[in-house]
Amino acid sequence: MTPTAAPLFLAADVGGTRARFLLARWRGPEADSPWEPLSRRVFADDDFPHFDAALDAFLAECPLGAEPKLAVIALAGPVTGRRARLTNRPWTIDADALSARYDWPRVELMNDFAAQAFGL
């Protein structure tokens, strides 16, 4: 798979005070690191009225033409179906709405504690 054809992946960790974003490219399991980070950013949640505004700010800083096809968002709050609401901030995140808005074929939401467990 050539680097230009390799899929891009957006990961986010959204808490009550900060939203962390990563855009990376898949390099394959043979590489020292299977993902090549392209852009990283941490934002203060207080600077944005809702999650989509923080996400828009991150995407605006990403390399031109960098369009992820997969997004996984871990957040501090319960996930019910394809929607989630942060426990300590009045933000609601809807996976289907994000998929439609950004034309992303796959958007997954998970509780941040569950995401931490997957990382162990």
Which role does the model predict for each range below?
Residues C62-L120:
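Short beta-strand-loop/turn "lid" adjacent to the catalytic site in phosphate-handling enzymes
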Residues M1, A31, E61-C62, A97:
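Short, flexible, glycine/charge-rich loop motifs used to bind or transfer phosphoryl groups or to couple energy/partner
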Residues T2-A57:
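Short glycine-rich, Thr/Ser-proximal phosphate-binding strand/loop in the N-terminal lobe
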